[in-house]
Amino acid sequence: MAPYCKDEEKYKVVSEIVKQIQKLKTQGIKIDNQIIIEILTVNGIRFSLEDGSWGLIRASSNKPSLVVVTESTTSESRKRKIFEFIDNLLKKTGKVGKYDQKI
């Protein structure tokens, strides 16, 4: 999924989200009763949960948008919870618009 984000803002938004998720990890935040066990910050952020489920946020390289991907090895419900977690963080920035598709 790709929510709209101005080209001049998208890298700042991703940087802000990286900092927020890193902070939430240190606080032991749970997403659908799963803690964040790993964070990779190459070209954005990918975080993994205890059960192997994950979420990813990065800036699109060729259009004014972000790329949001979620995956769960256990359930569609967990995949949606990860998306809701990411979406809430993005909405709080006030710099992200509508998605190009729905989950």
Task: Report residues per predicted region.
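Phosphate-binding and adjacent anionic-ligand microenvironments
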Residues: 1-69, 75-103
